[in-house]
């Protein structure tokens, strides 16, 4: 792919790596590429990061025809920069786009675009412990025309921002509230995609949980309001009587890259992983009879989020004495070890940016 480069006259001042937060500081450049019915994908370019212009009638602003991804670049102790399973993000975006009638952005072009931008932004990949460069590929319709329809033009972009440790105070268990009225996804819908509408629709549940003193909301299935699916914007796993349970990928749950990686590790360590429906009643029962040993969310931003308390209606259970479980800690240490190059990658998950 021929990528045009437009140099920024003055580079931005880089933030203090010890106070990065999440999503606050954008890097110097962004990747942009356009698609039209007539020409397909064209004009790949890396240009100075900054505002973009949109027509008020732009399809995306009215009908939400957009998708996005989330991934990271990591700097190893030796100074190398590496990505983590970027092809999985590319394939997931293809599936998201297909559901929203958006054009396919090929896997090889996706990975090449990410690598090209990260290479240009190498100085922005932080070196402080547990920091990384967050990468946000996204695509949206650019046609200016009202009326619900498949747009005739689209734009694919990538922006980046250095981020600190997701947990500034360390990896600590959180309290989550089971949401039994609102739903995140239904079969036949867009629950398996990474589109903005899914996240906009989840905000009310999050706000309700926070008002009651809970950090996240645990979503139930949209049909029966019975089976556990996701927690906040993360996949979730339960260790019950020595076995792992997590919701199956059946159209309502996002096929997480971290989720898939955790399942690989768990099975490699000899754990039985049940990708099956788990009812909230059985979950709470396990919490009360002592067989619920650990609960943790999984996702790119936090990697793993241990759960110390579950509330369903007026029923409350404490998980593992509100302490981080041994398996939760091992999963976190192993996966982050691979991502930052502290542990040999025997799975072939990391890709060095040269």
Which residues fall in each region the model found?
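Intrinsically disordered, low-complexity, positively charged segments
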Residues: 1-55, 61
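Conserved catalytic-core subdomain
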Residues: 1-17, 25-27, 168, 176, ...
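Conserved phosphate/anionic-ligand binding catalytic regions in large, soluble enzymes, centered on
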Residues: 55-72, 301-305
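Active-site-adjacent loop/helix segments that line or gate small-molecule/cofactor pockets in enzymes
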Residues: 24-32, 37, 46, 59, ...
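Short acidic-glycine loop/turn motifs at beta-strand connectors
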Residues: 33-41, 67, 74-79, 86, ...
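Extended Lys/Arg-rich, glycine-bearing segments that form polyanion-binding/interaction patches
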Residues: 16-19, 86-90, 94-212, 327
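Short glycine-rich loop/turn motifs
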Residues: 28-30, 68, 153-155, 173, ...
